[in-house]
């Protein structure tokens, strides 16, 4: 699977929420179908995301690149430490959850 292609497709056709605060909020409420976190995200943020995602039974995929690379992959001019997939749209991004 081409991660960049599927992420952009989810961004265009589905609902993707960027940012750690919103991602943690969605992890707490169970409002996401998949959470993606950058490898270099701050430890406190990663710990919170993994903890709440586990409680809500939401799969978490750790992006192998940095938050700068994740932001660039999404076509954003800023860093993205984490994001939540609320609706995958026409993408197959949820296949990452099975890895």
From Swiss-Prot:
Cystine pairs: none
PROSITE patterns referenced in this protein's UniProt entry, alphabetically: RIBOSOMAL_L30E_1, RIBOSOMAL_L30E_2
Record-level GO BP terms: translation
GO MF assignments: RNA binding; structural constituent of ribosome
A cellular-component GO term for this protein: cytosolic large ribosomal subunit
Pfam short name (any one): Ribosomal_L7Ae
Protein keywords: Ribonucleoprotein, Ribosomal protein
Family under the similarity heading: Belongs to the eukaryotic ribosomal protein eL30 family.
Name this polypeptide is given: Large ribosomal subunit protein eL30
Organism: Pyrococcus abyssi (strain GE5 / Orsay)
């Amino acid at each position: 699977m081409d991660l960049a292609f599927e992420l952009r497709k989810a961004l265009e056709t589905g609902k993707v929420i960027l940012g750690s605060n919103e991602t943690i909020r969605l992890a707490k409420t169970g409002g996401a179908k998949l959470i993606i976190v950058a490898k270099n995200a701050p430890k406190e943020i990663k710990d919170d995301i993994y903890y709440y995602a586990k409680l809500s039974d939401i799969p978490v995929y750790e992006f192998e690149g940095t938050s700068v690379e994740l932001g660039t992959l999404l076509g954003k001019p800023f860093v993205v430490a984490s994001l939540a997939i609320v609706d995958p749209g026409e993408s197959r991004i949820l296949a990452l959850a099975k890895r």
